Design a protein with these regions (language model features):
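Flavin (FAD/FMN)-binding glycine-rich loop and adjacent Rossmann-like elements that form
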Residues: 1-182
């Protein structure tokens, strides 16, 4: 919906970028917006994540007026609150009995022990301010093997979602919540 408007925003913090809005409506009329990319955050450091949240909150002073002025339908937007945690898409994955690869995804491979079927596009976020995210493929349907949920050397544990045994590129598709719920 608002990709062009997002890319036109010039953040005060040079280590941020506004991307297309992900919008979720709530029953009370509020909307949740996921659109600010915060670069330079170490997802394994609580201090770095806290600094990222503080930087994002400081950016709201400039971002909210920009949204009101440039995003049709948001002329009366008000900030109710910001997220208490950062959404970190990529950090680390378990080493499982099988690692789902980008070839598995793009070649629509079946697996003998499939536990779910994925079809979400391979959506890769930028990792630096000089680059933009991209969709590198749109699979028809691929199988997620049970083996990719089973960590090596750990008993009685299954790992689903973005931390399962996927390569980073395969996770661009397999990370989505519906697959983890399947």
């Amino acid at each position: 919906g608002y990709t062009e408007e997002g890319y036109s925003y010039e953040p005060q913090d040079e280590m941020m970028r506004l991307r297309g809005f992900n919008i979720a409506r709530q029953n009370n009329g509020n909307v949740l917006i996921n659109a600010l990319i915060i670069f330079g955050v170490d997802p394994l450091s609580e201090e770095s994540k806290a600094e990222g949240i503080a930087r994002a909150q400081a950016e709201m002073e400039y971002l909210i007026p920009y949204i009101r002025e440039n995003f049709k339908g948001f002329e009366k937007a008000e900030l109710v609150k910001t997220a208490e945690q950062l959404y970190v898409r990529e950090s680390r994955h378990i080493i499982g009995e099988y690692q789902l690869t980008i070839d598995d995804v793009l070649e629509n491979r079946d697996q003998w022990d499939k536990i779910a079927i994925g079809a979400y596009p391979v959506d890769v976020q930028p990792t630096a301010t000089q680059t933009y995210g991209t969709v590198i493929g749109s699979p028809d349907r691929y199988a997620v093997p049970f083996r990719s949920l089973v960590p090596l050397k750990v008993d009685n544990l299954l790992v689903v979602g973005r931390s399962a045994s996927y390569t980073s590129l395969a996770a661009g598709s397999a990370r989505v919540i519906p697959l983890g719920m399947a």
